[in-house]
Amino acid sequence: QRIFGENYVQEGVRKIQYFRDAQPQAEFEWHFIGPLQSNKSRLVAEHFDWVQSIDRLKIARRLSEQRPSSMPALNVLIEVNIDDEETKSGVAPDDLLAIVKEVAVLPNLKLRGLMCIPSAQADEAQSRAAFAKMKSLFEFCRKEGFDFDTLSMGMSADFALAIDQGATMVRVGSAIFGARDYSNR
């Protein structure tokens, strides 16, 4: 395993620094996959290789401005609120093309594709429909001329279904590491 995703900025930065010090030759790739607040964007821009959760132009602009010029462009994915859930972050499907056009031209960022997290209450048919809709949005953006290569969707409980619907990246932390223990956070 060399690709790791983190939901929490400070926890992720601690792990990144630990592994860079402990194994400087190792080629780990670090993905930030959680919601990102403006006040933590600099840490993400300076430490992570990917951000899978771009949900606002403001965050994309901050990451672009804060990415050190000595580092490669930050790989980013636009998070889509595919089920239109009020409690979830993400761009509405109808607003997707507008933000894609803006983010694609920002310096220091490389827009690689899209990410979604379907409703936790969705049954298999609903998840399949959400993943199929995401694949359709992904292909639409490609037809509009964007060089997307990454469709991140599916987690431990539904990754096989996501792959079946076209995911190129899945997030399977709990399937590998077990359920997260929040008692000592």
Language-model segment annotations:
Residues 161-164, 172, 176-183:
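Expand to "…catalyze enediolate/carbanion chemistry for C-C bond making/breaking, isomerization
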Residues 1-157, 165:
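Conserved alpha/beta-domain cores
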